[in-house]
Amino acid sequence: MTITSTQVYIALLTALIPAFFALKLGKELSK
C-alpha cells in the first residue's frame, strides 16, 4: 500500500482541524 501526497494532506487536515477547534474553544473558555 503506497501513500500518496494527497492521502498525507488529507490525514494532516483531519488531524489539524479538530485540534484547531479545540484550541479555539479552549481560548474562549479561559477568558
From Swiss-Prot:
It comes from the Eukaryota. Keywords: Chloroplast, Membrane, Photosynthesis, Photosystem I, Plastid, Thylakoid, Transmembrane, Transmembrane helix. One of its GO terms (biological process) is photosynthesis. The keyword Amino-acid biosynthesis does not apply. The chain crosses the membrane at residues 7-26. It is found in: Plastid, Chloroplast thylakoid membrane. The keyword Hydrolase does not apply. GO terms for cellular component: chloroplast thylakoid membrane; photosystem I. It is a single-pass membrane protein. Belongs to the PsaM family. NCBIfam families: PS_I_psaM (TIGR03053). This is Photosystem I reaction center subunit XII. It comes from Euglena viridis. The gene is psaM.
